[in-house]
């Protein structure tokens, strides 16, 4: 049984998810994980080069399964922050594959050892802000057809809502449209403190915005 909180950060590309996830993990000494295990990073470009949504769906599903085992071990020693998890995989690929993937999601849930987080932090921003942020960073990092492009061309927010409806865990939505990282972090701490009253594993954590 895990001893520490497991927090997943989800959201559209360009919403500020990674910035907020890294800040939260640093301030609270949680272990921070990206979605892809080190062992699979070397084949990501090959998978992306297929331009096959089925291929990327199975690739990220494998990433989730491998990370799940890592999280289960790490949660004995510290809190875990996951920068994307199964929710992204299903929200994005439901759109790319134009299929209802809820059956596959429930199949994962049926695996007794598969971990769901204690809380999901869903980071959003207005579409114009997201478009501008993606445009700014695309000058240095190419737009991914299975990531940034999906955020630009599809209604990913609605897809996320359909996936979130499949689980019974707190979903905290943090809108960064008019917030800098520190402001968003302060709002997040307030929301986490609020739900800690009904989420026992969070009660031992000091969710103060002043944490250094």
Regions found by a protein language model. Name each.
Residues 12:
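P-loop (Walker A) phosphate-binding loop of NTP-binding proteins
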Residues 131-212:
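NTP-dependent small-molecule kinase module
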Residues 1-4:
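Phosphate-binding P-loop
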Residues 92-159:
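A glycine- and Lys/Arg-enriched "phosphate-lid" helix/loop adjacent to the NTP-binding pocket
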Residues 9:
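Hydrophobic anchor at the beta1->P-loop junction of P-loop NTPases
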Residues 17:
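Conserved lysine of the Walker
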Residues 31-103:
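ATP-dependent small-molecule kinase phosphotransfer cores
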Residues 20, 24:
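Hydrophobic positions on the alpha1 helix immediately C-terminal to the Walker A/P-loop
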């Amino acid at each position: 049984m895990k001893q520490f909180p497991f927090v997943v950060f989800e959201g559209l590309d360009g919403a500020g998810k990674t910035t907020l996830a890294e800040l939260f993990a640093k301030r609270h000494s949680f272990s921070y994980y990206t979605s892809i295990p080190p062992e699979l990073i070397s084949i990501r470009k090959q998978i992306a080069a297929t331009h096959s949504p089925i291929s990327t769906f199975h690739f990220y599903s494998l990433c989730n399964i491998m990370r799940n085992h890592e999280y289960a071990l790490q949660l004995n020693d510290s809190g875990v922050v996951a920068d994307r998890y199964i929710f992204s995989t299903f929200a994005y690929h439901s759109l790319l594959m134009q299929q209802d993937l809820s059956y596959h999601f429930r199949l994962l849930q049926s695996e007794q050892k598969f971990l769901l987080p204690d809380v999901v932090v869903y980071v959003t921003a207005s579409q114009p802000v997201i478009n501008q942020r993606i445009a700014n960073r695309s000058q240095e990092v190419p737009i991914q057809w299975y990531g940034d492009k999906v955020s630009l061309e599809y209604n990913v927010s609605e897809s996320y809502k359909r996936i979130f409806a499949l689980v019974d865990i707190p979903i905290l939505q943090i809108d960064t449209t008019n917030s800098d990282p520190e402001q968003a972090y302060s709002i997040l701490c307030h929301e986490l403190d609020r739900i800690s009253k009904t989420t026992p594993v969070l009660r031992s954590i000091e969710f103060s915005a002043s944490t250094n």
